[in-house]
Amino acid sequence: MAITASMVKELRDTTGAGMMDAKKALTETDGDMDAAVDWLRTKGLAKAAKKSGRTAAEGLVAVAVSGSTGVAVEVNSETDFVGKNAEFQEMVAGIAQVALGADDTEALLAADMGGKSVADTVTAKVATIGENMGVRRMAKLEGDIVVSYVHNAAADGMGKIGVLIATKGGDAGFAKQVAMHVAAVNPASLDEASVDPEMVEKERQVQIDIARESGKPEQVIEKMIVGRMKKYLSEITLVNQAFVVNPDLTVGEAAKEASAEITGFVRLEVGEGIEKKVENFAEEVAKTAKG
């Protein structure tokens, strides 16, 4: 496969690797972007990084909460300009309200919204606004306490990132702080028990390859892997992450102090999969939560 300059740039943006290293990684992996990231990590040339996808969507994520139920819905548009359009925002807010009564995206698209289906409503809006758009996905969360948070809000209840948090015990104020944390840190799972086993095994193999590159004895490598996997799991699971509001505590420890149990979370980001550089994002959210 021919390795293009744009592929090299994408890999460099994702991993921070040098130009020649990025090109070699792509050559060694026949242009497979995800495999190239792992190749660079194995060689110690890149930090663990989320793989950048190919989604190029704009639009908004809207959140809505009613009692013990919360929903987050992503509605895409072709340009960011449409996301600022009041007519588009009104439609997105309405779709989020309808989503409270839907079980999944398919049901949402078929649900009634002012006398016609959500799908037909969106189609009509395409004709009015003159730009392609669509409901990409929805997620639902239930719990004793459910709160929502929107980061980079474009209007009330909608923005670029939408988060839902469900807790048992505690109060809405603490749950809101956890929602801000999730927006900033983007955990993969709630706890170790809910982590995808395939993801863990893939990371374990990468760490084994990295350790073997060091040339250390196998028994030393085994101990290294145990420590590295423990660190990895603490970084990707919500309850084990350092709380952005108070980094001296993990989120789980903070929940215990607040007499709360976090039972679930949802985080949707517009165009999920695109790697976007946001400087001091966690610091920004921590200040907002404290303020």
Swiss-Prot record:
Gene3D superfamilies, A to Z: 1.10.286.20, DNA helicase RuvA subunit, C-terminal domain, Elongation factor Ts, dimerisation domain
Chloroplast is among the record's keywords: no
Subcellular location(s) of the protein: Cytoplasm
Residue stretches spanning the membrane: none
Chain positions covered by the region annotation Involved in Mg(2+) ion dislocation from EF-Tu: 79-82
Function: Associates with the EF-Tu.GDP complex and induces the exchange of GDP to GTP. It remains bound to the aminoacyl-tRNA.EF-Tu.GTP complex up to the GTP hydrolysis stage on the ribosome.
UniProt xrefs under Pfam families: EF_TS
Family of this protein: Belongs to the EF-Ts family.
Name assigned to this protein: Elongation factor Ts
One Gene Ontology MF term: translation elongation factor activity
A cellular component annotation (GO) from this entry: cytoplasm
UniProt cross-references to InterPro entries, sorted A to Z: EF-Ts_dimer_sf (IPR036402), Transl_elong_EFTs/EF1B (IPR001816), Transl_elong_EFTs/EF1B_dimer (IPR014039), Transl_elong_Ts_CS (IPR018101), UBA-like_sf (IPR009060)
Keywords: Cytoplasm, Elongation factor, Protein biosynthesis
Lineage: Bacteria, Pseudomonadati, Pseudomonadota, Alphaproteobacteria, Rhodobacterales
